[in-house]
Amino acid sequence: MVVVDKSQRGVLFGRVENGVYGWFKNGNEKTDRKYMGEISNGLPNGQGTWTHPDGEKYEGEWKDGKESGQGIST
């Protein structure tokens, strides 16, 4: 049996659209939150870094688009 990891590395932008927070392939670095790291099923999954336009940052583990496990917020 061969298990294939379908996660990829990339960039996503997080923002609220129509009252719902979501992750998008395109965004504006000046207004949207930016995620760089592992992506699976269109969401942050694995190791990655999230940066807010105001400089706030989280670096660590992600699961299904949410901070999960170990990480550091600055």
Region spans (language model):
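Intrinsically disordered, low-complexity repeat tracts enriched in Gly/Pro/Ser/Thr and acidic residues
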Residues: 1-74
